Amino acid sequence: MVLYFSPVLTFFLANFFNSKSTTTENLQVFLVENQHRDSKRKINPTFSKKGIEVRQQNENLWSKIVALRFDYSVWGIIQLVLMMGLFFYINSVALIEDLPIDEEFNSVEEFYTAATSAYNQNAYTVGLPVHLCAYASI
């Protein structure tokens, strides 16, 4: 069952973005193509016009999956840069629990000094991989 999790999940994600064919047709083609994993007998696929059309539609599905995964990676970079790096840089109060500082201080000035240095350290730590990736691609 573990072996089928990723292909089946990918199939249903791809089918979600496909509007030209029905789920039943795609599922039948998917199961026929992957049936050799469950049994020792081999199935000879028929090369009908409908089968070729379904295969072409599946190629369109894979291109949509690639685009979806690309969007996820772009969103991850945006989230890393803006939500983490920028908000740590401007000392966002929402991220105070993520700072590696002590919970008790003797004075307010000690707290502000420790919090500011921790914010700056986290901003540089989060921003460093993004800068390395950006400069490595040049």
Curated annotation (Swiss-Prot):
Transmembrane segments: 76-96
EC number: 3.1.-.-
Molecular-function annotations in GO: RNA endonuclease activity
Keywords carried by this UniProt record: Endonuclease, Hydrolase, Membrane, Nuclease, Signal, Transmembrane, Transmembrane helix
Record-level GO cellular component terms: membrane
Stretches of the chain found on the membrane's Extracellular side: 25-75
Membrane topology designation: Single-pass type I membrane protein
Major localization class: membrane
Secretion signal, residue range per the UniProt entry: 1-24
Subcellular location: Membrane
EC class: hydrolase
Cytoplasmic side: 97-138
Function, as annotated: Endoribonuclease.
Family: Belongs to the RNase K family.
Name of protein: Ribonuclease kappa-A
Organism annotation: Ceratitis capitata
